[in-house]
Structure formats: C-alpha cells, structure tokens
C-alpha cells in the first residue's frame, strides 16, 4: 500500500471529509401509504463537518417536495506557517526579517461550505404546475491568495490566507 500523505500535513486525507474520532452514522428511511403519499429520508455523519441530510416526500400526481442540508469541508492545509503577523485576519502585516519559522503564525487553510435548500412542486392539474426552489450557501474560512514581494520578478511571491465569510441565497419560481 502506498500513500503520499505526510504526517506533518494530513490535509489531503481530510480535504472533503471529517475523519476525526466520533460516531459515524448512515440512515435511510422510506415510507409509502395506500393513499399515494410517500417519503424518503437519508442522512449521514450527523453532527460532523461533512453532515448530509435529505428529506423528500409527496403524493403521487399531486405534489412533491424536498429539504436538504449538505455540509462540505475543504481543508487545504493544516498547521500552515506564515511570517505575516495577525494571520489569519483581514489585516495582514509583516515584520521582516523573521528567520526562525518556529515563531511564525500557525493557521489552517480551508473553509466550510454549508448548503441548506429545498423545493415544493404542485402538479395536481397536470400538465399545469408550479414550483418554488430556494437555497442558501454559507462559506466560512480561509482561501488561498498570493501577492508579489515587490515589483521585481526576482523578489518572489507569498501565499496569503484570505478570510472568507459570505452567504448566497437563491430562489426560483416557475409555473
């Protein structure tokens, strides 16, 4: 067995999954009734950074709907070091020289993406219908940026931890 995972930075192993100690979970529930109603619930990794839940349901030839939660971590680097002061923050300052990397600021590159959404569709009078969709995506953490150390190409570049905290809300209606 071969692995290129370095024990000093296991971020590739954890890039999109929460592998910390804890209980793993995976649930699938399905229900059907004689009146045509149905539901499906699927969930995994409850309470973890990579939690997923999906609830669908409806009534045949009448309506259907869905609610979902999808959390995805994206680890880019663990215990990274930078000579910049106050990292990670929106105010990055430097104090050079700092020859000893053990005194540099430590941080984790990565962000958490949380998507919550759903839809409802009424189709009782087929082919006529209406549908409402909505979701909200929250992203929080650090993304990688870069900057030149000067105006000459010989000065090199430095990676910057750029704080990210934004929310996107989407909605649609069709009939």
PLM region descriptions:
Residues 1-3, 41-45, 57, 67-71, ...:
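Transmembrane beta-barrel strands of outer-membrane/channel proteins
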Residues 11-16, 38-40, 101-106, 117, ...:
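Extracellular loop and loop/strand-boundary signature of outer-membrane beta-barrel proteins
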Residues 4-9, 47-51, 61-63, 73-79, ...:
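Gram-negative outer-membrane beta-barrel proteins
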Residues 35-39, 51, 59-65, 114-116, ...:
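Outer-envelope beta-barrel architecture signal
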Residues 1-35:
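Outer-membrane beta-barrel initiation region
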